Amino acid sequence: MNTVNASMTVIGAGSYGTALAITLARNGHSVVLWGHNPEQIQKMQRDRCNQAFLPDVAFPDTLLLEADLARALAASRDVLVVVPSHVFGDVLRQLKPHLRPDARIVWATKGLEAETGRLLQDVAREALGEAIPLAVVSGPTFAKELAAGLPTAIALASTDAQFAEDLQQLLHCGKSFRVYSNPDFIGVQLGGAVKNVIAIGAGMSDGIGFGANARTALITRGLTEMTRLGSALGADPSTFMGMAGLGDLVLTCTDNQSRNRRFGIMLGQGKGVQEAQDSIGQVVEGYRNTKEVLALAQRYGVEMPITEQIYQVLYCHKNAREAALSLLGRTRKDEKHSA
């Protein structure tokens, strides 16, 4: 690819990165999509689709493929990072030497930093410094539906008001893709991490066969845990009633397109953690997120009993049914003021 002036460079050619790149290109923008595997990028260029993840969706003419990172980043000041959370910091450090002087970074990655449990904003600042404007997009989005042009809505938050306005204009499409701005940078990030954990729990409940009542209770109390942790970190509690909180939580807990939910279902049916992960065949973000969210909650003194029981299943070999019964057997609580 010769050097071009693109509206956005997307880093990450998995299902979600590809879907976002397709959406941007459909909006009439020139978009460069970069992936870490040159052979995959060459195949996508030949096929003009992502056969591995979205085989039925043809690329718009304005979606350009690039295997050379320096050229991809030279094409646009605005860079959308869509990679798993456990490699987020490594990818940003890889990008930094090639970023334009006027670069701005937005990510659609959902989760916390592996091992440390830090918010991705802290990872980004450490990797990139203080000067680069940052933003995050999050909300109820399945890649296949987004790529198919089905109606979707997300939330957008940024450290920079102009960047937020520019991104909203770039992403928003009145026909299918609605983008809500939100000033709560912490809350929009956190919702996407916690919902992954609760979705595993909802899946486990369904895998056991507990039914719709139990699933709904888990979603509702999971939202309480999300809001409580967010408040401790300085987020606006109302954020968690929006797209990046309740919206993403309901979607991920109730639809089998969710890898986290399917992973939980298999655990509820008695499969082991490794067997369930192997069966999914893609990254199950909630597996790592559970450890990270619980560590963050403990650091801030926030009680999260659902997250604790999911952790026990994933990392301490507790049976999923026993974990559910542990939650049911807790002492009576006041709904509004207790975990």
Curated annotation (Swiss-Prot):
Q: Name one Pfam family in it.
A: NAD_Gly3P_dh_C
A cellular-component GO term for this protein: cytosol
* UniProtKB keywords: Cytoplasm, Lipid biosynthesis, Lipid metabolism, NAD, NADP, Nucleotide-binding, Oxidoreductase, Phospholipid biosynthesis, Phospholipid metabolism
Catalysed reaction, written as an equation: sn-glycerol 3-phosphate + NAD(+) = dihydroxyacetone phosphate + NADH + H(+); sn-glycerol 3-phosphate + NADP(+) = dihydroxyacetone phosphate + NADPH + H(+)
Tell where it localizes.
Cytoplasm
Which sites are catalytic? K195 (proton acceptor)
Q: Where the protein is mainly located, per its record?
A: cytoplasm
Instruction: State the EC number(s).
Output: 1.1.1.94
Q: Which pathway or pathways does this protein act in?
A: Membrane lipid metabolism; glycerophospholipid metabolism
Binding sites annotated in the UniProt record for NADPH: S15, Y16, H36, K110, A143, R259, V283, E285
Q: Binding residues for sn-glycerol 3-phosphate, per the UniProt record?
A: K110, G139, T141, K195, D248, S258, R259, N260
GO terms (molecular function) for this protein are: glycerol-3-phosphate dehydrogenase [NAD(P)+] activity; NAD binding
Biological process, per Gene Ontology: carbohydrate metabolic process; glycerol-3-phosphate biosynthetic process; glycerol-3-phosphate catabolic process; glycerophospholipid biosynthetic process
> What family does the entry list?
Belongs to the NAD-dependent glycerol-3-phosphate dehydrogenase family.
The entry's function note states:
Catalyzes the reduction of the glycolytic intermediate dihydroxyacetone phosphate (DHAP) to sn-glycerol 3-phosphate (G3P), the key precursor for phospholipid synthesis.
Q: What is this protein called?
A: Glycerol-3-phosphate dehydrogenase [NAD(P)+]
Query: What species does this protein belong to?
Result: Serratia proteamaculans (strain 568)
What would be the name of the gene that encodes this protein? Answer: gpsA
